[in-house]
Amino acid sequence: MNQSVQTIMIIAGGTGGHIFPGLSVARYLMNHGYKVVWIGSKDRIESELVPVYNIDIKYICIQGLRGKKIYQKLITLLFLIFFAMYQSFKIIRCWKPDIVLSMGGYVSGPSSLVAWLYGIPVIIHEQNRIMGLTNRYVSRFAKKILQGFPNTVNGAITSGNPLRYEILSIPDPVHRLEGRTGPIRVLVVGGSTGSFIFNKVIPEVFGKLFGKLIIWHQSGKKGFNDTIQAYKKLHCNSSNYKVVPFIDNMAHAYSWADVIISRSGALMVSEISYVGLPAIFVPFNYHKDYQQYWNAFQLVKSGSAIIIEQERFTSDYVSIILGNWNRKVLLNMAILSKSLEMSNATQLVAQTVMRYLNGK
């Protein structure tokens, strides 16, 4: 390894909400002459996404602890975590990184701890409005803490959430939405794996408001066939809806949409605000700390979005809301959403790491 090039190790895994911000920062650092390496989990999406960018990635075996019974947690603590630390030790000894940027996910816990034991400085970035369990532990020995939303952690640097590069070129809401006519375009995104409740309710909404909506629906792979059948049973014109397992080009989807219905993961909320889209958020209801609810709270407070708890997410209720929104209302909501965006997060996160390496 060329020792004249400083090596930055990114630790991130599990979901796109951790992976995509990490990739944005990695690309920035690589463009500025740094070597970037990555620790993740082999059975999660980072194993597919990270190599595409010519980033060396190695894997550790780890899984989440939340929601398990006490004896299962103990087994995980005694075996999986210690094994993950052993794997991390071998990886870090091989790569000898100059600094670690932990972007969250369960994978970041053991690897960050081993880096700290090696005397390697650790910087963390918390994407969510409520700090995740793993980052809470890592924050105890982190040299710096960056946060995607204000007031998440006392003393942290508010950077915003690094966004995918392709999102940054989307025109602002006025140029994009003003002058549009026709049915309201509704983008439905239930995360990378889809959402059962969206797949059940949205076809019913489409039927109730037929002729008033055009739907682009990401169903996830598992829910794809059932969702397609739900739309077909309505015997409606198929040109007014499109169901796909996964949307590869989110920039195009965001540009196309007038309004979005989605979960409120941190990255999704940040992207929606940057693009300037009215939103109906349905927070994932199994987080004990209501993490997704608080991610969306600022947009709701601004009047650019609403939150519907999953228990109230019915076709009747959603139909009433969408039926009452016209293009003037949606444009005003989009402008309010855009006013809260933080577009330079990638640069802020990367430069924080670079400055620390350079002793500034």
Swiss-Prot record:
Protein topology in the membrane: Peripheral membrane protein
Family to which this protein belongs: Belongs to the glycosyltransferase 28 family. MurG subfamily.
InterPro entries in the cross-refs: GlcNAc_MurG (IPR006009), Glyco_trans_28_C (IPR007235), GlycoTrans_28_N (IPR004276)
Name the UniProt record assigns to this protein: UDP-N-acetylglucosamine--N-acetylmuramyl-(pentapeptide) pyrophosphoryl-undecaprenol N-acetylglucosamine transferase
Catalytic reactions of this protein: di-trans,octa-cis-undecaprenyl diphospho-N-acetyl-alpha-D-muramoyl-L-alanyl-D-glutamyl-meso-2,6-diaminopimeloyl-D-alanyl-D-alanine + UDP-N-acetyl-alpha-D-glucosamine = di-trans,octa-cis-undecaprenyl diphospho-[N-acetyl-alpha-D-glucosaminyl-(1->4)]-N-acetyl-alpha-D-muramoyl-L-alanyl-D-glutamyl-meso-2,6-diaminopimeloyl-D-alanyl-D-alanine + UDP + H(+)
Enzyme Commission number, as recorded: 2.4.1.227
Phylogenetic classification of the source organism: Bacteria, Pseudomonadati, Pseudomonadota, Gammaproteobacteria, Enterobacterales
CDD domains, per the entry: GT28_MurG
GO BP terms, alphabetized: carbohydrate metabolic process; cell division; cell wall organization; lipid glycosylation; peptidoglycan biosynthetic process; regulation of cell shape
Residues at which UDP-N-acetyl-alpha-D-glucosamine binds: T15, G16, G17, N128, R164, S192, I247, Q292
Domain of life (superkingdom): Bacteria
Alphabetic keyword roster: Cell cycle, Cell division, Cell inner membrane, Cell membrane, Cell shape, Cell wall biogenesis/degradation, Glycosyltransferase, Membrane, Peptidoglycan synthesis, Transferase
Molecular function GO labels: UDP-N-acetyl-D-glucosamine:N-acetylmuramoyl-L-alanyl-D-glutamyl-meso-2,6-diaminopimelyl-D-alanyl-D-alanine-diphosphoundecaprenol 4-beta-N-acetylglucosaminlytransferase activity; undecaprenyldiphospho-muramoylpentapeptide beta-N-acetylglucosaminyltransferase activity
Keyword Ribosomal protein: no
Keyword rRNA-binding attributed: no
Pathways per UniProt: Cell wall biogenesis; peptidoglycan biosynthesis
Cellular component, GO, one term: plasma membrane
